[in-house]
Amino acid sequence: MNLRSVAVAVAALLLLSGCAAPGAVTTRDAPPWPRPTDLTARAESAGLRNVWGERLAEHVHTHLTILDGDEPVTVPANIGHSDDRKFAAEIHTHNTSGIVHVESPTEQTFTLGQFFDEWGVSLGPEHVGGLRGELTVWVDGHRRIGNPRSIELTDLRQVVLVVTTVGEVPHLPAPFDWPPQYD
């Protein structure tokens, strides 16, 4: 192989692999992320269990918004929940509203990291699943610095995760309008 062929091969490889700086763009290799089908295993991976039918000592709701730039990412229905299988992990969803339910027979601290572990989607200080770029986190309308995994799921809390391209200014969306049954 001559030098010109090597140069062309290297140029093609760089073009195909994307020679932008790491994290320079948001990737779309994941959303929409499906709900897990193995409810028991996913719950156990998050330190949760099936509490279907148990008397509840704690019942709170947190709203989760995920944005890829300005595009909403749907939080699936029935993460950690199935009426047919009579399964309800302490943290679960019922629909695609973004409302995350915490229903537990004991009062304890549950976190956003546990919810993402149960969902099977990676969450860290610089990414949500396959979305990479700049992660901005708001909790109840206030900017939060640090690892979003540690955010506690408390009643009527609003968590917003926005992944943008480097240098793009993230925008806090309007607050979630809680349905009246949650007041």
Residue ranges and their predicted role:
Residues 1-7:
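Bacterial N-terminal signal peptides that target proteins for export
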Residues 15-18:
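C-terminal motif of bacterial Sec signal peptides marking the signal peptidase cleavage site
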Residues 20-183:
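Ubiquitin-like/PB1-type beta-grasp interaction modules and other compact soluble beta-rich domains
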